[in-house]
């Protein structure tokens, strides 16, 4: 009797093995039929939930997963959230650029003389040495250019800066 049971289990296992690997998805789904109508919360009748094995065989598995995802999570809310996130990201970027530009204009106005204070106006007209005058204006110019490059890098622009160090190289700020 145990040999008959073993033989029956072996045949059943072989049949199940080949039936699982014979379909594209691995399993054949039976058609489900609902004998009674099903209603939703508002009293509207729901369509019958019948699996069509031909449709499942044609579709790829990710599309079935997408259908299940859209069943549980309506697409309207997902797109609204995505659009809100994109708007917030763009809005934050625009605010950052505006604040950087505002800061740049305030610095440039202060240096050029638009927003000068009493200390800037009382600057002596002549210095003892011409080298001192050149050095002072050159160092001021270098500070202004450093501020411009920094703010340009913050705003997303890149300035190329060439320098010589054992040959010619291109460096970015």
UniProtKB/Swiss-Prot annotation:
The keyword Nucleotide-binding does not apply. The keyword Secreted applies. Its main location: secreted. One of its GO terms (molecular function) is pituitary adenylate cyclase activating polypeptide activity. Residues 23-80, 170-173 form a propeptide. Belongs to the glucagon family. This is Glucagon family neuropeptides. The lineage of its organism: Eukaryota, Metazoa, Chordata, Craniata, Vertebrata.
């Amino acid at each position: 009797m145990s040999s008959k049971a073993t033989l029956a289990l072996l045949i059943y296992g072989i049949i199940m093995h080949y039936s699982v690997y014979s379909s594209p998805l691995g399993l054949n789904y039976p058609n489900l039929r609902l004998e009674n109508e099903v209603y939703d919360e508002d009293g509207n009748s729901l369509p019958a939930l019948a699996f069509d094995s031909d449709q499942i065989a044609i579709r790829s598995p990710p599309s079935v997963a997408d259908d299940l995802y859209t069943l549980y999570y309506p697409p309207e809310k997902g797109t609204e959230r995505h659009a809100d996130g994109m708007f917030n990201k763009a809005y934050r970027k625009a605010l950052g650029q505006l604040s950087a530009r505002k800061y740049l204009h305030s610095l440039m106005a202060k240096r050029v003389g638009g927003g000068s204070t009493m200390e800037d106006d009382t600057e002596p007209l002549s210095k003892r040495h011409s080298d001192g005058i050149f050095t002072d204006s050159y160092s001021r110019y270098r500070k202004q250019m450093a501020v411009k490059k920094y703010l340009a890098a913050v705003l997303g622009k890149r300035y190329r800066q060439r320098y010589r160090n054992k040959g010619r190289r291109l460096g970015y700020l």
